Amino acid sequence: VVTPVMLVLLLALNVFTILKVKALEESAGGDKTEDVAQENDVTIGGEYVIKATTQISDAYKSGNTSNLSDKDKETLNMAKSVLDEIITDGMSDYEKELAVYKWMTANIGFDSGSMTVVPGDDSKPVDNPNGVLKNHEAVCVGYATTFRLFMQMLGIDCMVVHDSYLSHSWDLVKLDGQWYHT
């Protein structure tokens, strides 16, 4: 249960995150936020690890899957199938982001039963794009990394934001030069 105090803290953290992203962007000399902000290999709530998705999106863009594991190839094929279904020529970045957002909210449920992870139990992964796209269920980290994968595949800047205190993750997506929480 989220209390009013927790909501105020979360809003304050969101404002802090936006300011931090802007400061990182300025200190990096432009749009290099992703290079200086750590978003991968971060453990959330001691249970979920934010995994990198760049290798999969790079394979999508280049058409070269030779460096991908079988699991990553499977993830790529599932993600590509979704994009082929919802993205059309001539869409703006905003329209692409909105199409992905709508698809995810309509097709991926929140798996509250997986809030406690049993170490070594990978029977129903809900914290990574492969499991999310296969099972159509996710926890926040799964939503965030899957959304980021789609954005990377579409060439739209996106990063996973994490709050270790509240054990929560979400995305920042850059549209028309501005960062937005998603």
Give the location of each predicted region:
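Sec-dependent N-terminal signal peptides of Gram-positive bacterial secreted proteins and lipoproteins
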Residues: 2-18
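Sec-dependent signal peptide cleavage junction
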Residues: 15-29
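Alpha-helix capping and helix-loop boundary segments enriched in small/acidic/polar residues
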Residues: 27-30, 70, 135-138, 162
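N-terminal low-complexity, Pro/Thr/Ser-rich intrinsically disordered segments
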Residues: 34-75
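Active-site rim recognition segments
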Residues: 49-55, 127-131, 174-182
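Secondary-structure boundary elements
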Residues: 65, 71-132
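Conserved active-site-adjacent core of cysteine acyl-enzyme catalytic domains
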Residues: 118-138, 142-149, 153
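Hydrophobic/aromatic-rich core segments of domains that either
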Residues: 141-182
